[in-house]
Amino acid sequence: MAFTFAAFCYMLTLVLCASLIFFVIWHIIAFDELRTDFKNPIDQGNPARARERLKNIERICCLLRKLVVPEYCIHGLFCLMFLCAAEWVTLGLNLPLLLYHLWRYFHRPSDGSEGLFDAVSIMDADILGYCQKEAWCKLAFYLLSFFYYLYSMVYTLVSF
Protein backbone atom coordinates (compact mmCIF):
# COMPACT_ATOMS: atom_id res chain seq x y z
CA MET A 1 0.00 0.00 0.00
CA ALA A 2 1.61 3.21 -1.23
CA PHE A 3 0.52 6.78 -0.91
CA THR A 4 0.90 8.42 -4.32
CA PHE A 5 0.01 11.79 -5.75
CA ALA A 6 -2.93 10.17 -7.55
CA ALA A 7 -4.23 8.79 -4.24
CA PHE A 8 -3.91 12.25 -2.70
CA CYS A 9 -5.82 13.73 -5.65
CA TYR A 10 -8.62 11.22 -5.18
CA MET A 11 -8.78 11.90 -1.43
CA LEU A 12 -8.97 15.65 -1.91
CA THR A 13 -11.46 15.21 -4.72
CA LEU A 14 -13.72 13.12 -2.48
CA VAL A 15 -13.93 15.90 0.09
CA LEU A 16 -14.44 18.61 -2.51
CA CYS A 17 -16.96 16.51 -4.43
CA ALA A 18 -19.02 16.24 -1.24
CA SER A 19 -19.07 20.04 -1.06
CA LEU A 20 -20.16 20.22 -4.71
CA ILE A 21 -22.99 17.81 -3.94
CA PHE A 22 -24.16 20.15 -1.18
CA PHE A 23 -23.88 23.14 -3.54
CA VAL A 24 -26.06 21.41 -6.11
CA ILE A 25 -28.60 20.30 -3.50
CA TRP A 26 -28.82 23.92 -2.38
CA HIS A 27 -29.39 24.95 -6.01
CA ILE A 28 -32.20 22.40 -6.35
CA ILE A 29 -33.87 23.61 -3.16
CA ALA A 30 -33.55 27.25 -4.25
CA PHE A 31 -35.01 26.56 -7.70
CA ASP A 32 -37.87 24.64 -6.14
CA GLU A 33 -38.55 27.55 -3.81
CA LEU A 34 -38.54 29.94 -6.77
CA ARG A 35 -40.89 27.67 -8.70
CA THR A 36 -43.25 27.42 -5.71
CA ASP A 37 -43.18 31.18 -5.20
CA PHE A 38 -43.79 31.68 -8.91
CA LYS A 39 -46.88 29.45 -8.90
CA ASN A 40 -48.34 30.72 -5.62
CA PRO A 41 -51.61 32.53 -6.53
CA ILE A 42 -52.23 33.88 -3.02
CA ASP A 43 -52.01 37.67 -2.62
CA GLN A 44 -51.38 38.35 -6.32
CA GLY A 45 -53.00 41.78 -6.09
CA ASN A 46 -51.29 42.86 -2.86
CA PRO A 47 -48.43 45.30 -3.68
CA ALA A 48 -46.74 44.76 -0.31
CA ARG A 49 -46.67 41.01 -0.95
CA ALA A 50 -45.30 41.63 -4.46
CA ARG A 51 -42.40 43.69 -3.08
CA GLU A 52 -41.70 41.01 -0.48
CA ARG A 53 -41.72 38.35 -3.19
CA LEU A 54 -39.34 40.34 -5.38
CA LYS A 55 -36.94 40.83 -2.46
CA ASN A 56 -37.07 37.10 -1.74
CA ILE A 57 -36.35 36.28 -5.39
CA GLU A 58 -33.44 38.75 -5.47
CA ARG A 59 -32.04 37.29 -2.24
CA ILE A 60 -32.17 33.75 -3.61
CA CYS A 61 -30.56 34.79 -6.91
CA CYS A 62 -27.80 36.61 -5.05
CA LEU A 63 -27.05 33.48 -3.02
CA LEU A 64 -27.11 31.34 -6.16
CA ARG A 65 -24.62 33.67 -7.88
CA LYS A 66 -22.23 33.37 -4.94
CA LEU A 67 -22.02 29.59 -5.44
CA VAL A 68 -21.32 29.61 -9.18
CA VAL A 69 -17.66 30.65 -9.24
CA PRO A 70 -16.60 28.37 -6.33
CA GLU A 71 -18.32 25.41 -8.02
CA TYR A 72 -16.59 26.11 -11.33
CA CYS A 73 -13.21 26.65 -9.64
CA ILE A 74 -13.45 23.44 -7.61
CA HIS A 75 -14.32 21.45 -10.71
CA GLY A 76 -11.47 23.11 -12.60
CA LEU A 77 -9.14 22.12 -9.75
CA PHE A 78 -10.31 18.51 -10.17
CA CYS A 79 -9.33 18.54 -13.81
CA LEU A 80 -5.99 20.21 -13.10
CA MET A 81 -5.13 17.69 -10.38
CA PHE A 82 -6.05 14.72 -12.56
CA LEU A 83 -4.03 16.20 -15.43
CA CYS A 84 -0.97 16.51 -13.15
CA ALA A 85 -1.52 13.00 -11.78
CA ALA A 86 -1.86 11.58 -15.32
CA GLU A 87 -5.25 10.08 -14.52
CA TRP A 88 -6.48 10.25 -18.12
CA VAL A 89 -9.73 8.32 -17.73
CA THR A 90 -10.85 10.44 -14.81
CA LEU A 91 -9.84 13.60 -16.64
CA GLY A 92 -11.79 12.43 -19.68
CA LEU A 93 -14.88 11.88 -17.55
CA ASN A 94 -14.63 15.37 -16.05
CA LEU A 95 -13.70 17.26 -19.20
CA PRO A 96 -17.22 17.56 -20.71
CA LEU A 97 -18.60 19.19 -17.56
CA LEU A 98 -15.57 21.48 -17.35
CA LEU A 99 -16.12 22.59 -20.95
CA TYR A 100 -19.81 23.17 -20.20
CA HIS A 101 -18.91 25.25 -17.15
CA LEU A 102 -16.50 27.33 -19.22
CA TRP A 103 -19.09 27.81 -21.97
CA ARG A 104 -21.78 28.75 -19.45
CA TYR A 105 -19.48 31.19 -17.65
CA PHE A 106 -18.24 32.95 -20.79
CA HIS A 107 -21.74 33.16 -22.31
CA ARG A 108 -23.36 34.70 -19.25
CA PRO A 109 -25.27 37.97 -19.70
CA SER A 110 -22.87 40.87 -19.95
CA ASP A 111 -25.31 43.59 -18.91
CA GLY A 112 -23.77 44.23 -15.51
CA SER A 113 -22.80 42.17 -12.51
CA GLU A 114 -25.91 39.99 -12.46
CA GLY A 115 -24.05 36.89 -13.55
CA LEU A 116 -25.87 33.68 -14.39
CA PHE A 117 -28.96 34.07 -12.24
CA ASP A 118 -30.83 37.30 -12.87
CA ALA A 119 -33.89 37.88 -10.67
CA VAL A 120 -36.05 38.88 -13.63
CA SER A 121 -35.01 36.26 -16.17
CA ILE A 122 -34.96 33.38 -13.68
CA MET A 123 -38.70 33.71 -13.18
CA ASP A 124 -39.32 32.75 -16.81
CA ALA A 125 -40.77 29.25 -16.56
CA ASP A 126 -38.53 27.91 -19.34
CA ILE A 127 -35.32 29.29 -17.83
CA LEU A 128 -36.28 28.12 -14.35
CA GLY A 129 -37.07 24.65 -15.70
CA TYR A 130 -33.75 24.55 -17.56
CA CYS A 131 -31.83 25.58 -14.44
CA GLN A 132 -33.63 22.96 -12.39
CA LYS A 133 -32.87 20.21 -14.93
CA GLU A 134 -29.26 21.35 -15.06
CA ALA A 135 -29.03 21.09 -11.27
CA TRP A 136 -30.51 17.58 -11.25
CA CYS A 137 -28.08 16.46 -13.96
CA LYS A 138 -25.15 17.91 -12.02
CA LEU A 139 -26.33 16.14 -8.88
CA ALA A 140 -26.38 12.82 -10.74
CA PHE A 141 -22.93 13.51 -12.19
CA TYR A 142 -21.40 14.48 -8.85
CA LEU A 143 -22.94 11.50 -7.04
CA LEU A 144 -21.65 9.06 -9.64
CA SER A 145 -18.29 10.82 -9.61
CA PHE A 146 -18.11 10.60 -5.82
CA PHE A 147 -18.39 6.82 -5.87
CA TYR A 148 -16.01 6.59 -8.83
CA TYR A 149 -13.45 8.67 -6.92
CA LEU A 150 -13.91 6.49 -3.85
CA TYR A 151 -13.35 3.32 -5.88
CA SER A 152 -10.36 4.84 -7.69
CA MET A 153 -8.81 6.01 -4.43
CA VAL A 154 -9.04 2.54 -2.91
CA TYR A 155 -7.77 0.95 -6.12
CA THR A 156 -4.83 3.37 -6.30
CA LEU A 157 -3.90 2.80 -2.65
CA VAL A 158 -4.12 -0.99 -2.89
CA SER A 159 -2.55 -1.55 -6.31
CA PHE A 160 0.84 0.07 -5.63
UniProtKB/Swiss-Prot annotation:
This is Protein cornichon homolog 2. Regulates the trafficking and gating properties of AMPA-selective glutamate receptors (AMPARs). Plays an important role in the proper development of cranial nerves by facilitating the secretion of HBEGF. Keywords: Membrane, Transmembrane, Transmembrane helix. It comes from Gallus gallus (Chicken). Residues 32-72, 160 are lumenal. Its main location: membrane. Interacts with HBEGF. GO terms for biological process: cranial nerve development; synaptic transmission, glutamatergic; vesicle-mediated transport. InterPro entries: Cornichon, Cornichon_conserved. Coiled coil: none annotated. It is found in: Membrane. It is a multi-pass membrane protein. GO terms for cellular component: dendrite; membrane; synapse. Belongs to the cornichon family. One of its GO terms (molecular function) is signaling receptor binding.
